[in-house]
A protein has these predicted regions:
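Iron-sulfur (Fe-S) cluster-binding modules
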Residues: 1-207
């Protein structure tokens, strides 16, 4: 039977809901960052300039006199194009959201196969759910605030939070080559044992 998530995972803001669509991570981050930088309560939590199914989007905001340029991209081919533009100096961003799946998690491999029309409906569903939440901004989730206070160094961006909430990756090809060799050796041994177990009626191993 369906059950509610254990706390603190059962409590979320609209910012957590819209994470499932392209632009959602960016919008949730802006809801936090704009209020943090300006020092003023955010009156309008909707950042519609980062919404939509275009696979590359950009927007510029004025935050307390600072020009902030953000980018949103989904699909790794599109992400490479945008990365190349950034490397060449053609584009410059303060923050870029990248999602691999078309339209974001709403079309991820764990979802039923979909079409562009259904993606639009799924996206609209998340934004509608966002509106029904009592809280829309991530910083209004008191349970997240409690987690940071108790386990992550007191605030987002702290050294302790960075260490605990981020991971790193390194090339493991050498390890997989060793594993392949072990498997190949084991397969060869199995074949030899299988060959030795085949005998004729006199108990001789066929030549």
């Amino acid at each position: 039977p369906a059950e509610a998530f254990d706390m603190p995972f059962g409590f979320s803001t609209g910012g957590g809901v819209i994470f499932g669509t392209t632009g959602g991570v960016m919008e949730a981050a802006l809801r936090y960052a704009v209020e943090k930088v300006s020092g003023e309560k955010l009156k309008n939590v909707d950042f519609k300039m980062v919404r939509g199914l275009e696979n590359i989007k950009s927007a510029e905001l004025d935050v307390a006199g600072n020009k902030i340029r953000v980018g949103v991209v989904y699909g790794l081919a599109a992400a490479k194009k945008l990365a190349d533009r950034i490397k060449s100096g053609e584009e410059k961003f303060d923050f870029v959201e990248v999602m691999a799946c078309p339209g974001g998690c709403i079309s991820g491999a764990g979802q039923p196969q979909t079409t562009a029309d259904r993606r639009i409906k799924r996206m609209a569903g998340l934004y509608n759910a966002d509106k029904t939440q009592q809280l829309q901004k991530p910083q209004d989730n008191f349970l997240v605030e409690q987690c940071y206070a108790e386990s992550f160094g007191g605030c987002p961006g702290s050294h302790e939070a960075h260490n605990k909430l981020h991971t790193g990756y390194e090339n493991r090809n050498d390890m997989f080559e060793v594993l392949d060799n072990v498997i190949a050796a084991k397969d060869a041994k199995v074949k030899v044992v299988a060959a030795l177990s085949v005998t004729d009626n006199a108990g001789n191993v066929p030549a």
